[in-house]
Design a protein with these regions (language model features):
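N-terminal amphipathic alpha-helix/helix-capping segment at the start of soluble metabolic enzymes
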Residues: 1-27, 120, 283
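Active-site mouth loops of central-metabolism enzymes
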Residues: 19-37, 56, 75-83, 139-152, ...
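Hydrophobic faces of well-ordered beta-strands that scaffold small-molecule active sites
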Residues: 22-28, 53-55, 77-81, 99-101, ...
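Glycine-rich, proline-tolerant flexible connector loops at the mouths of alpha/beta enzymes
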Residues: 29, 35, 46-69, 100-108, ...
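Alpha-helix-loop-beta-strand connector modules within alpha/beta enzyme cores
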Residues: 60-81, 114-126, 186-197, 281-283
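Glycine-enriched alpha-helix->loop->beta-strand junction motifs that scaffold or abut catalytic
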Residues: 73-75, 92-99, 120-123, 190-196, ...
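Hydrophobic or amphipathic alpha-helical targeting/insertion segments
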Residues: 86-127
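Catalytic alpha/beta core domains of metabolic enzymes, predominantly
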Residues: 131, 139-285
Length: 352
């Protein structure tokens, strides 16, 4: 299944759906009212590769801050709204490029209608978000527990509320911390709607556990052609979310750009600090936009052969190492110059 015929939705100056590239999202963890701190974090996220950013808007002060934040950043700004419809309206009036709501907790139909009216007037897309943790009691009872079917029915019910108000500039997100339930729900929802989907595993956990859950869940979903935007939700620095999202997309062949670093797991032949060297290489190449593979190998015995699928690599040895290109040894390099030699080669890559 490849959902290249999903509805096209414009978010600020970005476009999703209709076969457009999958965009990477994150969410700030600053107080939105603190414009300086929020902008500072968003600019870091932009530099890491974030393409859409969401901020919580729990107060009118936070809604007002959106205007100044919007002026100082370069990616679409999404307002995350819970419970109070007035926050959604205020956020849109202050420049939000999209709002995220759950019509089920905004209040009466009149309140939802008031939000939709402003969105319609300004042509601002609404992301309808449903989480398994807040599934309605009647759906839990209907399906004898929290299930993929219940999550999908809840989401489509909420979408129907907005459609009945004459608006269809929508994105849907359905999330669960149960990875396989989340996958099943997306498979089911993708068969029932052409709206673009924002995909993520909610409450995934810390950097280690969250990355594993997100890689498995997002990998299974995206590999089926499902998903138009993604977020890797981690308990930690949001910049780590962007790094992980980029790697997931690149691993699936859905995104090019950025150096892929591969390294051997080390063995008794290793005579250098390969773990430290591999980490240094990963850090060193973050600002280099080449679309190539770099190998970091632990010894000169198997290093060249194992690195032949990489475009370039280094293999460590006691006192000296090797510079390798496509599995062929190019030259020997003093151990303390391996990193600098590799960086110089990368910076001059493609030059005659």
């Amino acid at each position: 299944m490849h959902r290249d015929n999903t509805k096209i939705v414009k978010i600020g100056d970005r476009v999703i759906g209709g076969g457009n590239p999958i965009l990477i999202q994150s969410m700030t963890n600053t107080k939105t009212e603190d414009v300086e701190a929020t902008v500072r974090q968003i600019l870091r996220l932009e530099q890491a590769g974030c393409e859409i950013i969401r901020c919580t808007v729990p107060t009118l002060e936070a809604a007002a801050a959106m205007k100044e934040i919007r002026k100082q950043i370069h990616i679409p700004l999404v307002a995350d709204i819970h419970f109070d419809y007035k926050m959604a309206i205020a956020a849109m009036e202050n420049g939000a490029d999209k709002i995220r709501i759950n019509p089920g907790n905004i209040g009466s139909r009149d309140k939802v209608a008031a939000v939709v009216a402003v969105a319609k007037e300004r042509n601002i897309p609404i992301r309808v978000g449903v989480n398994s943790g807040s599934l309605e009691k009647e759906l839990v009872e209907k399906y004898h527990g929290v299930t993929a079917q219940g999550i999908v029915e809840s989401a489509l019910d909420k979408v129907g509320i907005i459609e009945d108000l004459g608006y269809d500039n929508l994105v849907i997100s359905i999330k669960s911390s149960d990875v396989m339930m989340c996958v099943a729900a997306h498979e089911l929802l993708a068969q029932k709607t052409q709206y673009p989907l924002h995909v993520g595993i909610t409450e995934a956990g810390t950097v280690t556990s969250g990355n594993i859950k997100s890689a498995i869940g997002l990998g299974l979903i995206l590999h089926q052609g499902i998903g138009d935007t993604i977020r890797v939700s981690l308990t930690g620095d949001p910049v780590e979310e962007i790094k992980s999202a980029r790697l997931i997309l690149r691993t699936l062949g859905l995104r090019k750009g950025g150096i892929e670093v591969v390294s051997c797991p080390t063995c008794g032949r290793t005579r250098i600090d390969l773990i430290g060297l591999a980490n240094q290489v990963e850090k060193m190449v973050e600002d280099i936009s080449l679309d190539i593979k770099v190998a970091v190998m632990g010894c000169a015995v198997n290093g060249p052969g194992e690195a032949k699928e990489a475009d370039i690599g280094i293999a460590g040895g006691l006192g000296e190492g090797l510079l390798i290109k496509k599995g062929e040894i190019v030259k020997k390099v003093p151990e303390d110059q391996l990193l600098a030699t590799l960086r110089e080669e990368l910076l001059n890559w493609g030059q005659a």
